[in-house]
């Protein structure tokens, strides 16, 4: 492709609202243009990258046995009402009416649509299993669209859905799709980790996220420094501490702590280590009027997903009201503890072996020092209540945990019968008995993959595309293409030979200054660059550089095509 026939629109500066490197570079490189908050046009250069990602995805979906179809963006409300998600999904679901006053929505996912198709088309175990996928535009009415296409309202996703006669079949397909995702992200040249994850609003049981490692990632993942264990930090379990409890050394003493309502202010006021403090979280119990007290170390982060699964705790997790707290404890938040509390108490594993804690005294403006479980209050039930921290023992018993930030680009779920039961997606088994199908779903954020790749592959000059994702594999930058016959002839010859060799080449024949052409080639991140100028041609050479290291080399003009094609095929 010649640049004069293509469309290149680059900027020297990124818009002020762009925070992430990917957002800045995608705007500057002209990959996307903003139309409204969270809405973008994919320009020709960006669309080429998007199609490269889609091609890899399609190839690996076919290899995994998934069949492509295309479902609508606009979906009828009755399907969502049938599954129960019409109200549950909330304001992120963009609802609309047609001219006949019928309700529809812009689909953020397609579980309901595919379930409806399958229940109408498949009725026998002989037709199972089946695995379908599509690549389609989605819409979620985000409250605060931000970070460019990383969290846009409109985006492109690959969704796959599988249907099965039994769980064993679902597990087989789940494993195959998991492997396919690993191949996809490996082929795209991304550094990633598959991690055990929570199922969230999609529902179901087994779940894995595929996280591209990047400092700008919103998610935190925990992984073993020894084994292959990895999980989202919200799901990684902590283990009970080993050994005996530290012997109590101090007496229980009530101390006056005026205006001390946070762990930070408590540590400062008493001049104690934060690890010696306990914080109290009060949540509603399953039964009306009941509350449950949760205790964890002051320096640890409370995990509401784990807490919600505890026996006797209301689901969804609901914090107790200030009035209920005062009624039960006689004090306000910031001064609470287990002494004298008769209700259910859970304490985190990390507190079980400790002694002489500092805890709220259930009187405003007072705390206890020297608090010990079993002596000053009944032994609580010790459970996992917190997020893991770096250095914790790996849940598989192998090594210690490390933490890294990641960007979720894919997610696979074992939905089981969450949707098939609600929508009566059934089949006749080999005994002629009606059974509910097992279901899996598997998503990849195609547009998000592009942004995540840039977050992982950029420098001060611009994007550094991986081999599989580059808009073009090679850019030819001729100096004075319009004015120098020698340069133009050499550029056209190399361009034709590279095209004949099957390379994806951009010949930048724009009538621009050399600095503009060179800067744009670096900003656009094309992996291989050939610069052609009169001076080098007089010596029989062209200048060649790979974008990742930017080390320019003089290569004989007769050898450049072989050199580049060898690199492309490596």
UniProtKB/Swiss-Prot annotation:
User: SUPFAM superfamilies under this entry?
Assistant: Class II aaRS ABD-related (SSF52954), Class II aaRS and biotin synthetases (SSF55681), YbaK/ProRS associated domain (SSF55826)
Gene3D superfamilies from the xrefs?
Anticodon-binding domain, Bira Bifunctional Protein, Domain 2
Q: What is its main location?
A: cytoplasm
* UniProt-listed CDD domains: ProRS-INS, ProRS_anticodon_short, ProRS_core_prok
GO MF term set: aminoacyl-tRNA deacylase activity; ATP binding; proline-tRNA ligase activity
Q: What is its EC number?
A: 6.1.1.15
How does the annotation summarize its subunit structure? Homodimer.
Similarity comment:
Belongs to the class-II aminoacyl-tRNA synthetase family. ProS type 1 subfamily.
UniProt protein name: Proline--tRNA ligase
The organism named in the record is: Neisseria meningitidis serogroup A / serotype 4A (strain DSM 15465 / Z2491)
The lineage is: Bacteria, Pseudomonadati, Pseudomonadota, Betaproteobacteria, Neisseriales
